Amino acid sequence: MASSTIVLLLFLSFPFISFAASQAAKTFIFRIDGGSMPSIFPTHYHWYSTEFAEESRIVHVYHTVFHGFSAVVTPDEADNLRNHPAVLAVFEDRRRELHTTRSPQFLGLQNQKGLWSESDYGSDVIIGVFDTGIWPERRSFSDLNLGPIPKRWRGVCESGARFSPRNCNRKIIGARFFAKGQQAAVIGGINKTVEFLSPRDADGHGTHTSSTAAGRHAFKASMSGYASGVAKGVAPKARIAAYKVCWKDSGCLDSDILAAFDAAVRDGVDVISISIGGGDGITSPYYLDPIAIGSYGAASKGIFVSSSAGNEGPNGMSVTNLAPWVTTVGASTIDRNFPADAILGDGHRLRGVSLYAGVPLNGRMFPVVYPGKSGMSSASLCMENTLDPKQVRGKIVICDRGSSPRVAKGLVVKKAGGVGMILANGASNGEGLVGDAHLIPACAVGSNEGDRIKAYASSHPNPIASIDFRGTIVGIKPAPVIASFSGRGPNGLSPEILKPDLIAPGVNILAAWTDAVGPTGLPSDPRKTEFNILSGTSMACPHVSGAAALLKSAHPDWSPAVIRSAMMTTTNLVDNSNRSLIDESTGKSATPYDYGSGHLNLGRAMNPGLVYDITNDDYITFLCSIGYGPKTIQVITRTPVRCPTTRKPSPGNLNYPSITAVFPTNRRGLVSKTVIRTATNVGQAEAVYRARIESPRGVTVTVKPPRLVFTSAVKRRSYAVTVTVNTRNVVLGETGAVFGSVTWFDGGKHVVRSPIVVTQMDTL
């Protein structure tokens, strides 16, 4: 020990050297072995600051979920420090992005009975929301009739621009903001003309997600008359702690997100909701992904972490937030829509959607034009300064979706003199429609309808059109449908772990909004609205966060893995027409790569019968199984670990509520794989479950034993699932996989289902 201290002191005695003064400095995150701190230093901060000429270069110091710091240095300086014997990992700070009513009823939540009643609406569970902050004055954040703040709470309400501790109450019990990473990365720092250097929300996204997860009942809620009714979150009595890590027009930096994880765990949250991902970190391994690292630190302390699956669907392998200790949520529609039809001069009425609330067209027909007819893609996309006013003035303009915000295209049309817009999906979005609060009369139509409108505009000598805005309609069928934008599997890092885990409402969701910007978020939008309607996996994630709060309140002893298992094994696989779930982008039946285990069903999740628990040691074994060594794993776990030396474990044996059998592409002929699962009985003490197998096409699946007997003395039973397939004959199809399931029945009300995925691919 003395010799290692001497080595460290010798290393520290050298001044920090800049190898290239001309290099631009940037923020790097340094993962440090906290146990290596020499005893001469009173704190880790003092130790870290000895590495730099100026203490001001340190951005954050991390203590709770992560030992280390972030600092502004040159790449060569970062490489130099990488050789320090106490440095476990170094990674560059990266920018992430946000994954941007009626949904509680659609999830089966009802007053006076079921999970709301059993959990007392999530009373006293604390949800930490990592987002753009919060607008505390909204009715959704009233603390009327709430009890005192839970005594275990250790957080604070920070002061800043237009925010003070007085803005917190018994509902919003904590509010912090993390700006040091942004201030270091952005020239001139945060733009205070459009942002608040405080927890106050200048974007709206954080207010929306917070109220979706835990908003109070707000009567007579609507967005300019759309979706009128009672707005409420999934867990109306849960407490909210806002952690502002994302900044308007600047995104979210890893260094700030990691600092928020550190604070949230220290503060005492029970659930973390993080509708953030993608950006530069979309394919990073777990040990270089601060969201994965921070969420492991949280999960290891018993905190449930819910994250969004990303909005890059419907492309395969587009799902983000892949770590197995995170619950990854895709997006689906609900049974409410806002129809706005495009009416053509030839009499055809084509289905569309819109949230336009201005002066309607009242059936008046206008000339219609498609700028893309000339072959200029930028004009077809209605990009800034691409439309010829002579061509579009006084006309309805057909714009292709993509490359710029949907509502911004309408503003371009308006500036060029157009009177309206029809926004047409491309093939990638298919028939997936999202309502927007347009500034001009406008509607969105699917790919097929868009092609019809373009064909009409190009073939008719005097094409004309109008838009009919039809308000709000509920009871839409089919619903739910997997949103075309929702991130899809397979899991690009660990294909043995099916992602997303499940889907939840994420299309046209009504929730609270900021006063700082209008409903479009555009600087030119002067409108104010208490509520807004948004779509994205960002909106789906807080539904599961709120659901976790309800389950945690009803079952305080459940671990994060048990809560996720309860949700995953009790999902719905059919829509409200009693048909298989549909993929919005294709109109065809969806697969587990689209929806994971299925659609969240809170009525059944409260009493799942059997659950699959996962311990910290199980996660460590999983990390060993994918080839990580002890030092690499320590980057994630904080503490030293050991991997098995006799036999390498299989990643498929992680006790996950889904099963994926991955065979290498060079394995030809008859192959098989066996995985082990251990079920824990949380239902009646005396129970017998029997297995029912739905084998994937061309695959044989066996379960041993086929019968699980539980008693008051025996609450856990293990079973083996063996998958056998002839890779020469099996047809994997467009997805590259075939799908089945294993379901356990007790003869009563419990149906415990796990999807089975069989695929061939070579893991990284």
From Swiss-Prot:
Expressed in roots, leaves and flowers of mature plants. Its EC number is 3.4.21.-. It is an enzyme of class 3 (hydrolase). Residues 377-457 form the PA domain. Keywords: Glycoprotein, Hydrolase, Protease, Serine protease, Signal. It holds the Pfam family PA. Glycans are attached at N191, N578. The keyword Cytoplasm does not apply. Residues 103-606 form the Peptidase S8 domain. GO terms for biological process: plant-type cell wall modification; proteolysis. GO terms for molecular function: serine-type endopeptidase activity; serine-type peptidase activity. The keyword Signal applies. It comes from the Eukaryota. GO terms for cellular component: plasma membrane. Induction: By methyl jasmonate. Residues 1-20 form the signal peptide. Residues 46-99 form the Inhibitor I9 domain. The active site is at D131 (charge relay system), H205 (charge relay system), S538 (charge relay system). Belongs to the peptidase S8 family. This is Subtilisin-like protease SBT1.6. It comes from Arabidopsis thaliana (Mouse-ear cress).
